[in-house]
Swiss-Prot record:
Keywords: ATP-binding, Cytoplasm, Kinase, Nucleotide-binding, Pyrimidine biosynthesis, Transferase. This is Uridylate kinase. Inhibited by UTP. Homohexamer. The keyword Transcription regulation does not apply.
Length: 240
C-alpha cells in the first residue's frame, strides 16, 4: 500500500460509540473492534493518540440542567472519561499493544498525569496514548480536550468519529436530500452555521491550523484507509 499521509494522529471517540446497541455503559464487542482499528493504524506506522468522551456513563451538562452544580457535574464527567480510557487501555493491551493513559486530573494510583513532553515520548516509543479527563477544567467538552491535546502533541490530523459519515448541509437523519461535504474551510463552517464540534474546540483547531476530519467509524478498516490518503468523510482545514 501507499505511504501514510499522516505520521501522528489524534482520534476522538464519543463515549456513546462504546455502547453499541445498548443505552448505557460499554459493549465489549464494540470496544474490541475499535481497539483492533487503532492497533491496525499503529502497526501501519502511525503514532496514535486517543481521546474518549464519557457520555455513555455520565453527562455533567445534562444533570446541571436538572439542578446539579455544573462544576460538580463536569468533574463527574471527567471521571467517566477515565473509566472509558481504562477500558480501552485494557482492550488494546489484550491485543498486545503498549498503552499509557494520561489524565488531566491527578489519579496517580490509576494512571499518569498528562505531561506534554512525556506524552510525545510515549508516542515516539511506539505506545498508544489515551488522554483522559478532558482539559481538566469544568465547562470544557472532550471535543475541546481533543483539540487541545492534538495541538500540544503536534498531531498532523485530528479525527473525530461520529454517528454520521461526515458533515452535511442539514441533518441527514431528518432530510433525505441532505448533501455531504467532501471538504470545507473553517470559515465556510462558520458562515454556513454547520455543526462540527463545540465552539471552543473549533476555535482552537482553526487558530492552530489543525486539519480536522469528521467521519463515521462503523465500516471496518476506515481508519487505516484515511491514513493512506483516502478521502473519507469531510476534511476541514484552512481558511477561505
Amino acid at each position: 500500500m501507499s505511504e501514510l499521509s499522516y505520521r501522528r494522529i489524534l482520534l476522538k471517540l464519543s463515549g456513546e460509540a462504546l455502547m453499541g446497541d445498548g443505552d448505557y455503559g460499554i459493549d465489549p464487542k464494540v470496544i474490541n473492534r475499535l481497539a483492533h482499528e487503532v492497533i491496525e493504524a499503529q502497526q501501519a506506522g502511525a503514532q496514535v493518540a486517543l481521546v474518549i468522551g464519557g457520555g455513555n456513563i455520565f453527562r455533567g451538562a445534562g444533570l446541571a440542567a436538572s439542578g446539579m452544580d455544573r462544576v460538580t457535574g463536569d468533574h463527574m464527567g471527567m471521571l467517566a472519561t477515565v473509566i472509558n480510557a481504562l477500558a480501552m487501555q485494557d482492550a488494546l493491551e489484550k491485543l498486545g499493544a503498549k498503552v499509557r493513559v494520561m489524565s488531566a486530573i491527578k489519579i496517580n494510583d490509576v494512571c499518569e498525569d498528562f505531561i506534554r513532553r512525556r506524552a510525545i515520548r510515549h508516542l515516539e516509543k511506539g505506545r498508544i496514548a489515551i488522554f483522559a479527563a478532558g482539559t481538566g477544567n469544568p465547562f470544557f467538552t472532550t471535543d475541546s480536550g481533543a483539540a487541545l491535546r492534538a495541538i500540544e502533541i503536534g498531531a498532523d490530523l485530528l479525527l473525530k468519529a461520529t454517528k454520521v459519515d461526515g458533515v452535511y448541509d442539514k441533518d441527514p437523519k431528518k432530510h433525505t436530500d441532505a448533501v455531504r461535504y467532501d471538504s470545507l474551510t473553517y470559515d465556510q463552517v462558520i458562515l454556513q452555521g454547520l455543526e462540527v464540534m463545540d465552539t471552543a474546540a473549533f476555535a482552537l483547531a482553526r487558530d492552530s491550523d489543525l486539519p480536522l476530519r469528521i467521519f463515521g467509524m462503523s465500516e471496518p478498516g476506515v481508519l487505516l484507509r484515511i491514513l493512506h490518503g483516502e478521502q473519507i468523510g469531510t476534511l476541514v482545514q484552512g481558511r477561505s
